[in-house]
């Protein structure tokens, strides 16, 4: 974990959830969850979960038969997301987008809310996303502005 990633510990996850989620992230999370639900996936991977705003929206909008795996590089963010919880079971797992700990072709959809622009090697991370997607799978992500790879 880099020093920047370590900075998101202590009170930061709670402050992030309390202030930034309602001001910035909630609306986009709902949009990504709606788009994901429209694809009727069986298995969804969320990368850069943060405090779980997208995870909660996915859990509410996807059928209980859809498996959701929520990952983040920062354990403190995952801990905050777990503490808040979801409306149904979700697998929470620390993971690095540069080296996803999943078998090839294991997810129907990969969702990344405002995380891609922070990947130190975007091409490598997106290669990992492609690797874990099933043939015909979908990647849904958003960024603040343009993205350069």
Language-model features, listed with the residues they occupy:
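N-terminal, positively charged/glycine-rich alpha-helical extensions of SAM-dependent methyltransferases
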Residues: 1-14
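Conserved alpha-helix/loop element of class I SAM-dependent methyltransferases that forms part
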Residues: 22-42, 57
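Conserved class I S-adenosyl-L-methionine
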Residues: 138-149
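A short SAM/SAH-binding and catalytic strip from SAM-dependent methyltransferases
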Residues: 108-122, 145
């Amino acid at each position: 974990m880099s020093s920047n990633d370590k900075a998101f510990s202590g009170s930061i996850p709670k402050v992030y959830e309390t202030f930034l989620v309602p001001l910035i992230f909630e609306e986009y999370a709902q949009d990504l969850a709606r788009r994901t639900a429209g694809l009727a996936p069986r298995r969804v991977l969320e990368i850069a979960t943060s405090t779980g705003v997208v995870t909660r929206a996915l859990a509410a909008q996807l059928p209980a038969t859809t498996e959701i795996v929520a990952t983040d590089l920062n354990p403190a963010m995952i801990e905050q997301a777990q503490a808040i919880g979801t409306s149904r079971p979700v697998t929470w797992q620390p993971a690095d987008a540069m080296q996803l700990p999943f078998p090839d072709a294991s997810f129907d959809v990969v969702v990344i809310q405002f995380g891609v622009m922070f990947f130190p090697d975007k091409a490598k991370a997106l290669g990992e996303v492609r690797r874990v997607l099933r043939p015909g799978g979908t990647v849904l992500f958003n960024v603040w502005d343009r993205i350069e790879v």
